[in-house]
């Protein structure tokens, strides 16, 4: 596709197969003009437009006035390719030219319409009137330079637009965008362009070369919003995806038209419109019965755009011959569809007169009105029918009453698989699995002729997963009924815990016992009398809800699947739930998806028609989109609306579901993307609060981690970066304020400040920084990172815990008396040198022996060794373990483990008390009594229990009493947290728990004291 759109018009696209063209056409008409394809009769023709419409259109900045065109053509007269550089006009002159009244045009009226509605090729234009000779000569001078004839003046509009906005032509990226610059390919979006199809003249290229002689933009006009190519430069990808605000937003009055004036028409919206947002234009089209799609196809009637941005949609529309339509053209189409007031009044009077004429001729049949399922009969005369006819009416009345009392979700529940909306492939897989279940798992053991062995990959159960309301349970029931199976449903309202071990309770026990009896007893389904009792299938609904109330339910369900003799269908919403982590290994996984809005809209239209509701198709599609594919919820809304109205329009759906829309779960990353997106500034305050409070813990952390990567769209072109830094400072200050508020919430339980914290931590930074995300370092991925604070906080707590362990071990060794801070700042470096330097410089055996002795001296374990090394690592500094050979490391580990059996342990948490199977969750501190009181009691206890004590031990204890006093005094007087001894004191004789009595009175503490005295305060394990 050439970059010059006019070349497309100059190509000989003869659709008549070489037939002779009609005579009487001028040179201007020789171009192949797009003709409007056959459209429904409801679409009004856009060929002609009155003078008021054209005058109103000229107020848009995308169309130049007549005076500007004459000045441009006179300036370019006879210049050929070497056009002089135009001077920039002042803003006041632009406004004056735009606001000048248009002169009356008589001769060139048809061409005015062509200029105004360039996107809509008129079908009624046959022979346009030739312009005056002077104007023709002016246009001819430029046309001769290009070798073309009959071109419009829209290229001058483009030149004026470039002259008014010269800054948009710059860019420093090597983006091979689809820009129209010299050397570029395609059509970019960096410049505002006129709406005409013939706006790609060579003049704008020459103007661009004259204004921007430097080729910093690379291949193509790779400006700030330059094409969609490889924008690898500093500014080439800056504003990609940005949708600018309409230039005349809210300045035009939205017209009113006939209710269904756009019925049967399909629109595609492209670019930025003149006064409407894209969402507003979509709502306007759907309100009058039109359809809006996202891509161009053969069924598209119009491409709605106020400027030809030259994207994929524009090129596709030109290839398929889809006419272009401006916003003003859409307004005219709607406005002309509304009849005049006099016509409406006359039509209403005629309608009333017809009713009056027909009313006496009608018989008075029985009128049946439905109000909440009740029938009200009005009128006394009954049409002359037989008794049979009246009886049929009575029967019909009774049936209507019975069916009217049902909810629509039950009334229109699918009866056959073809009635299920969407997921037909999943229905087919479930049908095939159920049909072949008996052959695979019941008869597979029979080695008869022609019997297939069971497939090793086959599953005895199936797991249906998907959002609620899309037909999972209905699918299970319908398919089971179709195959002649009796579906036994067990949902979340039933007790589904672990079955009783005493299975003899059988069906007389709990629901779990009944299920176990059902799946394990073959006589229930496979007895001799099979015809009287149908085969069964167990439907376990909402298995992801088997939580605390159903203890052991999932494990018992897995055991039931293994031994089951009937098919089991499990249904859940979230197949990735942790509760189902083990269940998915035993089930065939079938993932149900949400049906499309077109599928749901078609089904809802059928139901509305059966219920006598007049509903628009786009209204039903909007309802399907608002409920996120939940057809059950859509039917409930539709039934509720049918009680108060008989016609459901698009606006009715929007008005009802704006306040009662279905909630959906969104991740914190999705919430941050919406807050910081280009449309984040258009969100209402309640929407921002909902997004921020979707996860009040993670959303602020993700925002704090990523807000500096966003370039705000509100700062515009900021070469110096001062505006962006100002916004960053304000956002950082708001986050700091939120941290102060969050401390009050978390520490002092001031939860009434939650909204203030939400405002400061999420809403204010997002309002300041929403825009395009960009990378700040080479190699960085351009997506939101997870909050780094959580990982750093966890690492900090782990390091503090490990340092506390090493601190307690060093204190217990009695080689140093220091606090944790001194250990980290002063001693850790010295300890690291003593542990690593010998391994680097000395021979292996000597180094290993020295390091092990040093570790024994300070009661350091291997975990402490790793802690000291890990805490001594710093970014940008070498690893302390560098230079140590792997053989030396393995020798050190081996030597330390060899001496562990005889190693002296001085820390209380390393003491292994005999008889204690596992450590207690809450250890009790041993009570160390004064020496003067504990020794007599201890000796007394030893003498009273002499049958269990050796006399030699008692003698040694008496001898070591003077040496036993010093360690006990040190332990009692030292208040350090690290040397608090924690033991599980138990008595061996009478089974009493010594935690309930003083440590000095127990036998265990007495023996502990003896051992401590014998080893000089050291205990051997």
UniProtKB/Swiss-Prot annotation:
Q: What does the record give as the function of this protein?
A: May be involved in DNA replication and thus regulate cell proliferation.
Record-stated family: Belongs to the activator 1 large subunit family.
User: PROSITE patterns, per this entry?
Assistant: BRCT
- Cited InterPro entries: AAA+_ATPase (IPR003593), ATPase_AAA_core (IPR003959), BRCT_dom (IPR001357), BRCT_dom_sf (IPR036420), DNA_pol3_clamp-load_cplx_C (IPR008921), DNA_replication_fac_RFC1_C (IPR013725), P-loop_NTPase (IPR027417), RFC1 (IPR012178)
- Start-end of Gly residues biased regions: 219-236, 1011-1021
Compositionally biased region (Basic residues): 123-138
> What tissue specificity does the UniProt entry give?
Expressed in roots, leaves, shoot apical meristem (SAM), flag leaves and panicles.
Tell me if tRNA-binding is a UniProt keyword of this record: no
Q: Is Nucleotide-binding there in the keyword field?
A: yes
Taxon lineage: Eukaryota, Viridiplantae, Streptophyta, Embryophyta, Tracheophyta
Which superkingdom does the taxonomy of this entry point to?
Eukaryota
UniProt biased composition (Acidic residues): 197-207, 945-958
Q: Which UniProt keywords are listed?
A: ATP-binding, DNA replication, Nucleotide-binding, Nucleus
Quote the CDD domains the UniProt record gives: AAA, BRCT_RFC1, HLD_clamp_RFC
Where are the compositionally biased (Polar residues) regions?
A: 374-392
Q: Where in the cell is it found?
A: Nucleus
Any one cellular-component term (Gene Ontology): nucleus
Question: Its quaternary structure?
Answer: Heterotetramer of subunits RFC2, RFC3, RFC4 and RFC5 that can form a complex with RFC1.
Entry protein name: Replication factor C subunit 1
């Amino acid at each position: 596709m050439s970059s010059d759109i006019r070349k497309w018009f100059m190509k000989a696209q003869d659709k008549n197969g070489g037939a002779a063209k009609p005579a009487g056409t001028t040179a201007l008409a020789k171009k192949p003009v797009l003709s409007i394809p056959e459209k429904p009769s409801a679409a009004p023709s856009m060929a002609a437009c009155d003078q008021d419409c054209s005058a109103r259109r000229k107020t848009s900045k995308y169309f130049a006035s007549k005076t500007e065109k004459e000045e441009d053509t006179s300036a370019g007269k006879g210049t050929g390719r070497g056009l002089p550089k135009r001077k920039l006009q002042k803003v006041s002159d632009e406004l004056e030219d735009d606001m000048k009244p248009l002169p009356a045009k008589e001769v060139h009226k048809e061409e005015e319409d062509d200029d105004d509605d360039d996107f809509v090729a008129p079908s009624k234009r046959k022979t346009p009137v030739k312009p005056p000779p002077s104007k023709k000569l002016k246009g001819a001078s430029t046309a001769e330079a290009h070798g073309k004839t009959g071109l419009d003046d829209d290229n001058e509009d483009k030149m004026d637009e470039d002259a008014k906005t010269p800054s948009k032509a710059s860019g420093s990226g090597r983006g091979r965008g689809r820009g129209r610059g010299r050397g570029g390919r395609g059509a970019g979006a960096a410049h505002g362009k006129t709406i005409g199809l013939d706006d790609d003249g060579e003049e704008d290229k020459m103007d661009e070369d004259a204004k921007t002689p430097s080729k910093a933009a690379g291949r193509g006009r790779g400006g700030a919003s330059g094409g969609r190519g490889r924008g690898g430069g500093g500014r080439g990808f800056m504003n990609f995806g940005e949708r600018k605000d309409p230039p005349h937003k809210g300045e035009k009055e939205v017209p009113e038209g006939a209710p269904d004036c756009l019925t049967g028409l399909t629109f595609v919206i492209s670019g930025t419109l003149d006064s409407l947002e894209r969402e507003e234009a979509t709502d306007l089209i759907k309100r009058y019965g039109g359809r809006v799609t996202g891509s161009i196809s053969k069924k598209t009637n119009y491409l709605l755009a106020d400027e030809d941005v030259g994207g994929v949609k524009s090129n596709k529309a030109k290839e398929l011959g889809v006419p272009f339509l401006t916003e003003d053209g859409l307004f005219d189409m709607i406005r002309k569809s509304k009849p005049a007031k006099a016509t409406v009044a006359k039509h209403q009077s005629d309608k009333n007169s017809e009713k009056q004429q027909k009313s006496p001729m009608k018989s008075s049949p029985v009128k049946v009105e439905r109000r909440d399922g009740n029938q009200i009969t009005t009128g006394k005369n009954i049409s002359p029918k037989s008794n049979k006819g009246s009886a049929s009416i009575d029967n019909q009345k009774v049936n209507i009453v019975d069916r009217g009392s049902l909810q629509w979700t039950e009334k229109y529940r699918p009866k056959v698989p073809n009635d299920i909306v969407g997921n037909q492939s999943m229905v087919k897989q479930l049908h095939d699995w159920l049909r072949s279940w008996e052959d695979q798992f019941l008869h597979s053991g029979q080695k008869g002729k022609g019997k297939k062995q069971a497939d090793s990959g086959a599953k005895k159960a199936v797991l249906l997963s998907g959002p609620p309301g899309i037909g999972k349970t209905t699918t299970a029931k319908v398919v089971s009924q179709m195959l002649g199976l009796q579906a036994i449903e067990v949902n979340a309202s039933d007790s589904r815990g672990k079955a009783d071990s005493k299975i003899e309770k059988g069906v007389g026990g709990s629901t779990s016992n009944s299920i176990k009896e059902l799946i394990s007893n073959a006589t229930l389904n496979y007895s001799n009398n099979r015809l009287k009792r149908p085969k069964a299938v167990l439907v376990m609904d909402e298995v992801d809800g088997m939580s605390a109330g159903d203890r052991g339910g999932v494990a018992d369900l897995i055991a039931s699947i293994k031994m089951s003799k009937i098919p089991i269908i499990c249904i859940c919403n979230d197949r990735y739930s942790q509760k189902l982590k083990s269940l998915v290994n035993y089930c065939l996984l079938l993932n149900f998806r949400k049906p499309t809005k077109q599928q749901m809209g078609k089904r809802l239209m059928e139901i509305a028609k059966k219920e006598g509701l007049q509903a628009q198709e786009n209204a039903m599609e909007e309802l399907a989109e608002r409920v996120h594919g939940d057809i059950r919820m859509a039917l409930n809304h539709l039934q509720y609306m049918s009680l108060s109205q008989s016609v459901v329009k698009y606006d009715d759906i929007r008005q009802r579901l704006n306040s009662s829309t279905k909630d959906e779960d969104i991740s914190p990353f999705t919430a941050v993307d919406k807050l910081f997106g280009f449309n984040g500034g258009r969100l209402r305050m309640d929407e921002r609060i909902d997004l921020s409070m979707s996860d009040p813990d993670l959303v602020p952390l993700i925002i704090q981690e990523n807000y500096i990567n966003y370039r705000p769209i509100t700062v515009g072109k900021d070469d110096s970066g001062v505006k962006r830094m100002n916004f960053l400072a304000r956002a950082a200050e708001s986050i700091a304020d939120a941290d102060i508020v969050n401390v009050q919430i978390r520490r002092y339980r001031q939860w009434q400040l939650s909204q203030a914290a939400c405002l400061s931590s999420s809403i204010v930074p997002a309002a300041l920084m929403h825009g395009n995300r960009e990378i700040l370092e080479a190699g960085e991925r351009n997506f939101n990172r997870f909050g780094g604070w959580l990982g750093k906080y966890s690492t900090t707590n782990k390091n503090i815990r490990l340092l506390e362990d090493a601190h307690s071990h060093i204190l217990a060794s009695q080689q140093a008396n220091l606090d944790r801070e001194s250990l980290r700042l002063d001693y850790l470096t010295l300890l690291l040198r003593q542990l690593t330097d010998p391994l680097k410089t000395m021979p292996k055996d000597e180094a290993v022996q020295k390091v092990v002795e040093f570790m024994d001296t300070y009661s350091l374990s291997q975990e402490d060794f790793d802690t000291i090394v890990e805490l001594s690592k710093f970014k940008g500094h070498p690893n302390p373990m560098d230079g140590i050979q792997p053989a030396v490391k393995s020798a050190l580990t081996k030597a330390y483990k060899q001496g562990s059996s005889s190693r002296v342990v001085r820390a209380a948490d390393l003491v292994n008390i005999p008889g204690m199977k596992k450590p207690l969750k809450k250890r009790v501190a041993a009570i160390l009594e004064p020496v003067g009181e504990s020794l007599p009691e201890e000796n007394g206890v030893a003498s009273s229990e002499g049958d269990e004590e050796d006399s030699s031990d008692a003698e040694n204890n008496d001898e070591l009493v003077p040496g036993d006093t010093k360690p006990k005094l040190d332990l009692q007087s030292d208040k350090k947290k690290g040397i608090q001894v924690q033991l599980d004191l138990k008595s061996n004789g009478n089974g009493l728990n010594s935690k309930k009595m003083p440590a000095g009175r127990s036998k265990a503490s007495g023996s502990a004291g003896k051992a401590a005295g014998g080893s000089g305060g050291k205990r051997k394990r």
